[in-house]
Protein backbone atom coordinates (compact mmCIF):
# COMPACT_ATOMS: atom_id res chain seq x y z
CA UNK A 1 0.00 0.00 0.00
CA UNK A 2 1.35 3.44 -0.95
CA UNK A 3 0.12 6.47 1.02
CA UNK A 4 0.01 9.84 -0.75
CA UNK A 5 -0.26 13.38 0.55
CA UNK A 6 0.05 16.02 -2.15
CA UNK A 7 3.34 15.56 -3.98
CA UNK A 8 4.87 13.17 -1.42
CA UNK A 9 4.18 9.47 -0.86
CA UNK A 10 5.18 6.81 1.65
CA UNK A 11 7.75 5.76 -0.95
CA UNK A 12 9.29 9.23 -1.16
CA UNK A 13 9.16 11.95 1.49
CA UNK A 14 6.10 11.03 3.58
CA UNK A 15 7.39 9.52 6.80
CA UNK A 16 4.18 9.62 8.85
CA UNK A 17 1.05 11.45 9.81
CA UNK A 18 -1.48 11.71 12.61
CA UNK A 19 -5.19 12.26 12.78
CA UNK A 20 -8.42 11.34 14.46
CA UNK A 21 -11.68 9.56 13.74
CA UNK A 22 -14.68 10.09 16.00
CA UNK A 23 -12.51 11.21 18.92
CA UNK A 24 -9.98 8.38 18.52
CA UNK A 25 -6.47 9.65 17.90
CA UNK A 26 -3.74 7.83 15.97
CA UNK A 27 -0.27 8.24 14.52
CA UNK A 28 1.21 6.33 11.57
CA UNK A 29 4.86 5.91 10.55
CA UNK A 30 6.22 4.24 7.42
CA UNK A 31 9.27 1.98 7.33
CA UNK A 32 11.99 4.43 6.26
CA UNK A 33 14.81 2.84 4.29
CA UNK A 34 16.31 3.83 0.95
CA UNK A 35 13.72 5.91 -0.91
CA UNK A 36 10.92 5.00 1.53
CA UNK A 37 9.73 7.70 3.89
CA UNK A 38 12.63 9.81 5.14
CA UNK A 39 16.27 8.96 5.65
CA UNK A 40 17.95 10.93 8.43
CA UNK A 41 19.89 8.06 10.01
CA UNK A 42 21.94 5.18 8.62
CA UNK A 43 19.69 2.56 10.23
CA UNK A 44 16.00 2.29 9.19
CA UNK A 45 14.72 1.65 12.74
CA UNK A 46 16.18 5.00 13.84
CA UNK A 47 14.27 6.79 11.06
CA UNK A 48 11.07 5.10 12.23
CA UNK A 49 11.73 6.04 15.88
CA UNK A 50 12.35 9.71 15.01
CA UNK A 51 9.19 9.74 12.87
CA UNK A 52 7.10 8.17 15.64
CA UNK A 53 8.54 10.74 18.07
CA UNK A 54 7.50 13.53 15.67
CA UNK A 55 3.97 12.18 15.19
CA UNK A 56 3.34 11.39 18.87
CA UNK A 57 4.42 14.91 19.85
CA UNK A 58 2.03 16.35 17.28
CA UNK A 59 -0.90 14.09 18.18
CA UNK A 60 -0.41 15.29 21.79
CA UNK A 61 -0.16 18.99 20.96
CA UNK A 62 -2.51 19.26 17.98
CA UNK A 63 -4.81 16.22 18.17
CA UNK A 64 -7.73 17.61 16.15
CA UNK A 65 -5.85 19.00 13.15
CA UNK A 66 -7.66 16.55 10.86
CA UNK A 67 -11.00 17.87 12.16
CA UNK A 68 -9.81 21.42 11.39
CA UNK A 69 -8.91 20.36 7.85
CA UNK A 70 -12.21 18.52 7.32
CA UNK A 71 -14.39 21.34 8.65
CA UNK A 72 -12.27 24.40 7.83
CA UNK A 73 -12.75 25.45 11.47
CA UNK A 74 -9.56 26.77 13.11
CA UNK A 75 -11.00 26.33 16.60
CA UNK A 76 -10.03 22.63 16.35
CA UNK A 77 -6.34 23.55 16.11
CA UNK A 78 -4.19 23.06 19.19
CA UNK A 79 -0.49 24.01 19.21
CA UNK A 80 -0.35 25.34 15.67
CA UNK A 81 1.41 28.31 14.06
CA UNK A 82 -0.16 29.80 10.92
CA UNK A 83 3.37 30.72 9.83
CA UNK A 84 5.02 27.36 10.39
CA UNK A 85 2.55 24.61 11.21
CA UNK A 86 2.80 22.07 13.98
CA UNK A 87 5.43 21.71 16.69
CA UNK A 88 7.41 19.11 14.72
CA UNK A 89 7.03 20.74 11.30
CA UNK A 90 8.56 24.11 12.21
CA UNK A 91 12.10 22.77 12.90
CA UNK A 92 12.08 20.90 9.58
CA UNK A 93 10.96 24.03 7.75
CA UNK A 94 13.47 26.24 9.60
CA UNK A 95 16.29 23.83 8.68
CA UNK A 96 15.45 24.05 4.99
CA UNK A 97 14.58 20.36 5.03
CA UNK A 98 17.96 19.29 6.45
CA UNK A 99 16.68 16.34 8.49
CA UNK A 100 20.13 15.61 9.88
CA UNK A 101 20.06 18.88 11.80
CA UNK A 102 16.72 18.20 13.53
CA UNK A 103 16.64 14.40 13.78
CA UNK A 104 19.37 13.54 16.24
CA UNK A 105 20.35 10.99 18.85
CA UNK A 106 20.12 12.19 22.44
CA UNK A 107 21.64 10.54 25.48
CA UNK A 108 19.30 8.71 27.83
CA UNK A 109 18.99 10.23 31.29
CA UNK A 110 20.51 7.14 32.92
CA UNK A 111 23.53 7.24 30.60
CA UNK A 112 22.85 3.77 29.21
CA UNK A 113 22.82 4.84 25.56
CA UNK A 114 21.09 7.13 23.15
CA UNK A 115 17.79 7.29 21.32
CA UNK A 116 16.84 8.85 17.96
CA UNK A 117 14.38 11.75 18.23
CA UNK A 118 13.31 14.78 16.29
CA UNK A 119 13.91 18.15 17.90
CA UNK A 120 10.61 19.98 18.48
CA UNK A 121 9.99 23.71 18.30
CA UNK A 122 10.44 25.58 21.58
CA UNK A 123 8.70 28.93 21.99
CA UNK A 124 10.92 29.64 25.01
CA UNK A 125 14.11 29.14 23.01
CA UNK A 126 12.71 30.29 19.63
CA UNK A 127 14.55 27.29 18.22
CA UNK A 128 14.34 23.50 18.02
CA UNK A 129 14.98 21.77 21.35
CA UNK A 130 15.14 18.18 22.60
CA UNK A 131 12.97 18.70 25.67
Regions found by a protein language model. Give the residues of each.
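N-terminal pro-sequences and low-complexity stem/linker regions of secreted or lumenal proteins
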Residues: 1-131
